[in-house]
Each structure stands twice: as structure tokens, then as C-alpha cells.
């Protein structure tokens, strides 16, 4: 459910805007999307884990807000990010 350092570094390298970028919106969306994927897999086997389900819904909401920010700021970048991460926009 959490990302280890190697996974975070891999996501940062694949979504960097510039060489020293570690926290741009694109990276934040990529990390949240990866956490959502892991948490969804966890909830497949642990149906009654309501606390994790609530955390999942909060993460989905945060990702949605970040994506709407990117969509308003740079629509082309938004489309590229959606395709790269593999989620519906």
C-alpha cells in the first residue's frame, strides 16, 4: 500500500519535468495513482477493511483535484499524463 524508495525513485524519473524535479503535480499524480492501484489490490482480498477503503476514496479525490488543476493549466500535458499513467480522464 505504501511505496518503497525504489518505486518512488522510478516514478520520479519517469515523470520529471526537469532534472531536479521531485514534487511537480505530474509526479504527485503518478505517485497517488500507484498507491491507489496497490490499495485497490489490497481491498480485493480484504473486503471488510473499511478504514483502507476510506483512505482510498480520499486519495482518489486528491488525484481528481490535482488532475483538474493540470487540465486547467495545460490541457496537452493533462492528456499526455492520462495516457502515460493509464487512467481515464
UniProtKB/Swiss-Prot annotation:
InterPro entries recorded: Ribosomal_uS15, Ribosomal_uS15_bac-type, uS15_NS1_RNA-bd_sf
Gene3D superfamilies linked: 6.10.250.3130, S15/NS1, RNA-binding (1.10.287.10)
A GO biological process held by the record: translation
One Gene Ontology cellular component annotation held by this UniProt entry: cytosolic small ribosomal subunit
Name of a matching Pfam family: Ribosomal_S15
Keywords: Ribonucleoprotein, Ribosomal protein, RNA-binding, rRNA-binding
GO molecular-function terms, A-Z: rRNA binding; structural constituent of ribosome
Function: One of the primary rRNA binding proteins, it binds directly to 16S rRNA where it helps nucleate assembly of the platform of the 30S subunit by binding and bridging several RNA helices of the 16S rRNA. Forms an intersubunit bridge (bridge B4) with the 23S rRNA of the 50S subunit in the ribosome.
HAMAP family: Ribosomal_uS15_B (MF_01343_B)
Quaternary structure annotation from Swiss-Prot or TrEMBL: Part of the 30S ribosomal subunit. Forms a bridge to the 50S subunit in the 70S ribosome, contacting the 23S rRNA.
Family: Belongs to the universal ribosomal protein uS15 family.
Protein name per Swiss-Prot or TrEMBL: Small ribosomal subunit protein uS15
Species of origin: Prochlorococcus marinus (strain MIT 9515)
